[in-house]
Amino acid sequence: MKSFATTVLLVTPGIYAAALSGRQGQAINSSCKVIPGDTAWPSRQIWSQLNDTLDGRLIQSTPQAAVCRPGGYGSISENGTECTTLKEDWDYAKAFLDSAVEIMNPWYQNTSCSPFYRVDQPCTLGNYVSYAIPVSGPEDVVTAINFTQTHNVRLVIKNTGHDYLGKSTGTGGLSLWTHNLQSKQIVNYTSPAYSGPAIKVGAGVTGGEALLHASQFGYRLVSGDCSTVGYAGGYSSGGGHSLLNSVHGMAADNVLEWEVVTADGRHLVASATQNSDLYWALSGGGAGNLAVVLSMTAKVHPDGLVGAATLSFNATSSPSNTSYISAINAWWTFLPTLIDAGASPSFNIYTNNFLIYNTTAPGKSAQDMSTLYAPYLSTLSSLSIPYTFQTYTAPSFLQHYNATDGPLPYGPYVASQLFNSRMIPRSLSSSPSNLTTAILSSVATDAPGIWQLGCLGINVNSTRISHPDNAVAPHWRTAMAVCLEFSLYDWAIPEEEMVARRQHLADVIHPAIVKVTPGSGAYLNEADPLVYPVGEDGWKDAFYGANYERLRGLKREWDPERVFYAYTAPGSEEWVSDAEGRLCRV
């Protein structure tokens, strides 16, 4: 893949002038963060002084898709060959991971410098940050906090750019880019709360990188299906679902301590025994809102055999659509049997197809999987539904992971998606018919786009998973699955059509699933801001449940000056973005 690296440079007059085009000298409300063109926006000299403080490491935003735009942008020139290569790679995380400013969500990339839309127009920053600091240690964080507080500039924290709620970018922002914090170490951790093997990783380490490192020492760890997600970033802090949840709990349940810099510039450790309220909040309450994470220490677990299974059937081969619906209902009823046995099935439901593309069962064999699935396969046979079922035994979790979510380091998953999440309460297993009806109608073939419900079966109930007191939303503890209402983003389709599909998700698909899952919630890292606008209250219960008010109180305590902001984080309702992207106090 062609590398499109962001350039380390000082502010140049040409770029500065482009940023101000049409808006120079604009006065704003003092309650708003400044953006380029405002009278209070820091001068070139001030940015140059910041660059000197950082020994020349300040990065000026240069969108990589500038190669597709007339005139390019900054140090990047228009280049048709490089544009073609970039478009081929655009759907995959590897195109974004080494950029200080790029994000993977199509909505927050906006169309200001897209390689697909409005390519006849000049490249502008739009929602991208203006500058970034490649964090090398706590001093860089303190420098950024002081600068943004002094000059009223928005502060942003970015790790890998896996961000579907826009928390890691923002118009006119100065970004703390934690990608270069790449340390990895297996340690013998000792504390009153836990003694045993653990891994300490820098904030820039991805889940796949952490897993590879742990496996060299005979361990596995709780990381995400997508290997390029930051292990110590929003993933673990947001809860973190995994193929290993039903055995080892949520990612946040495994965190032992956080090394952070707080809003007032203190460099400290938060654990179950020191700064325990901050530890509680960071472990499940979301990232980017209370402190900047430099490193995380988490449990690792002895590796071993992993039983696996796949299963598929479809409505076309079923005796009738009624039989297919009965099979889906029976699946929901059977699911608790699997997850109670420590298995986590990854499955997709379509209008006419059902697919379990992976079942992860640590400590089990292929024969165990056949035995475990036997009751459900018997149900399919009684319904005269033909199916394809396969099992295997992997000698280690790493080999199983590579076979299902690999190959590492990048894996198979695309970055450009439309989705929103919902947890399926275990209580529905006894009467799932309304759930099945809602799912099949939501993913119907006459809906705009190709939709599916993609789910992971889990059991992280506190009665079977030992975990520290943390801010993981209570909805997780009573769920039997976390699901995505999901469709791929199609860049070949006109922009207006993709906007309409997104609106369909917000107006039709998600409300239908919510209606049949009352009292449940959503994964705070996998949601669409159109579904959860910050000006409404639905996200508070969906993402945090009963923990919200305590988290809001800790925001006031640990960040009284509101140094940090993250969309739909506790306290974020105090802010709103205006029409030009300024972040303003309500």
Curated annotation (Swiss-Prot):
Sorted UniProt keywords: FAD, Flavoprotein, Glycoprotein, Oxidoreductase, Signal
Involved pathway(s): Mycotoxin biosynthesis
Catalyzed reactions: betaenone C = betaenone A
Keyword Oxidoreductase included in the entry's annotation: yes
Residue span, FAD-binding PCMH-type domain: 124-303
Annotated signal sequence range: 1-17
Glycosylation site residues: 29, 51, 79, 110, 146, 188, 314, 321, 358, 402, 434, 461
The enzyme's E.C. designation: 1.-.-.-
GO molecular function, one term: oxidoreductase activity
Pfam families (alphabetical): BBE, FAD_binding_4
Family: Belongs to the oxygen-dependent FAD-linked oxidoreductase family.
Biological role stated in the UniProt entry: FAD-linked oxidoreductase; part of the gene cluster that mediates the biosynthesis of betaenones, phytotoxic polyketides involved in leaf spot disease in sugar beets. The first step of the pathway is the synthesis of dehydroprobetaenone I by the polyketide synthase bet1 and the enoyl reductase bet3 via condensation of one acetyl-CoA starter unit with 7 malonyl-CoA units and 5 methylations. The C-terminal reductase (R) domain of bet1 catalyzes the reductive release of the polyketide chain.
Protein name: FAD-linked oxidoreductase orf1
Organism, as annotated: Neocamarosporium betae
Protein's gene: orf1
